[in-house]
């Protein structure tokens, strides 16, 4: 049984020191597509965290009974089933957001973070640790999404969660929104800037040369 210190490290590590996007450069494609608004970034964070945590838990519970030759198929079946459930819940209770997220909820099944944690961690680790690892990696993914979404929506549209924060010139205010921030390439540059800032602050994350 894992102690509290180990559980805390597994939960906090992916958010701070081993972020799946900032350090491992995983899950970048969806991060580019769903961060034009805080609302979509938050819902995608919740969806991926739920899938990652629950898939880790279920895979860990049956890890000793999965033949090595079919382990990837079993993992993908579990992940796909959870993605279908999450997608149906969103369709039922957050239809407008589900439409905005489009295919990206369904594509969680191919997300490198979810598949990577299932194979590299859940297959070798007890259920509780695997569950916490899934939550930690989901929150680490979400931290980057929400940071990028905050900048893009605030300065690209003058709002947060659809609520006007900066009064726009078109409405008689003072702020001229930067439409470039709402385009997908801006997310790429913002994520790159975040990675650079993190590695300046944490030099140990810079890859060794040679």
UniProtKB/Swiss-Prot annotation:
Disulphides: none
Pfam families from the UniProt entry: Rnf-Nqr
GO biological process terms on file: sodium ion transport
Subcellular location: Cell inner membrane
HAMAP family: NqrD
Xref: InterPro entries: NqrD (IPR011292), NqrDE/RnfAE (IPR003667)
Family: Belongs to the NqrDE/RnfAE family.
One Gene Ontology CC term in the entry: plasma membrane
Record organism: Shewanella pealeana (strain ATCC 700345 / ANG-SQ1)
Protein name: Na(+)-translocating NADH-quinone reductase subunit D
Membrane-related topology note: Multi-pass membrane protein
Record's keyword terms, sorted: Cell inner membrane, Cell membrane, Ion transport, Membrane, NAD, Sodium, Sodium transport, Translocase, Transmembrane, Transmembrane helix, Transport, Ubiquinone
GO molecular function: oxidoreductase activity, acting on NAD(P)H, quinone or similar compound as acceptor
Role, per record: NQR complex catalyzes the reduction of ubiquinone-1 to ubiquinol by two successive reactions, coupled with the transport of Na(+) ions from the cytoplasm to the periplasm. NqrA to NqrE are probably involved in the second step, the conversion of ubisemiquinone to ubiquinol.
Catalytic activity: a ubiquinone + n Na(+)(in) + NADH + H(+) = a ubiquinol + n Na(+)(out) + NAD(+)
Residues annotated as transmembrane: 10-30, 42-62, 72-92, 103-123, 131-151, 178-198
Subunit field text: Composed of six subunits; NqrA, NqrB, NqrC, NqrD, NqrE and NqrF.
